[in-house]
Amino acid sequence: PEPSRPLAPSRPSDEDPSVISPLGDDDGHRFKRGLLIHRLLQSLPDFATGERLAQGKAYLSRSIHDLSPGKQEEILAETLGVLTHPDHAGLFGPGSLAEVPITGIVAGKNGIHVLSAQVDRLLVTEEAVSVIDFKTNRPPPETEAQINPRYLRQMAAYRNALREIYPDR
């Protein structure tokens, strides 16, 4: 038998194409914005809280990013808003990890799959395992009902794999 293709929950499905129309107005800015925010969310927690603003400004002002001062401020404000939000404090504090690979065997609607993924942040404590995975390509939903079902399936796959690794949490 042929091995199944690894399940990669963050890979876009057919219902949400990853190719942007060359006739669109975006010029790839939403992808650039997402990459920059992800990079800041990965690296800024390594700095003391009081240093994060200056480090973020230094990173975003690099000429290679080609960002206006206003766009730099917008991206940094959004990033720092996530980092300082009380609900996320542990995920950006001591002991948390960035860009963590997760592999495992998970059950899906079409049978058993090998999961191969990378989560943005992971925190393992004595009581729980917490994961945060950022979606910067769209405005955040205001209610749980507005969350794209694909993202719910993605997080469920992560939860199922992590339950196998950390069954008591």
Predicted features along the sequence, with ranges:
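Structural signature of nuclease core domains in nucleic-acid processing machines
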Residues: 1-169
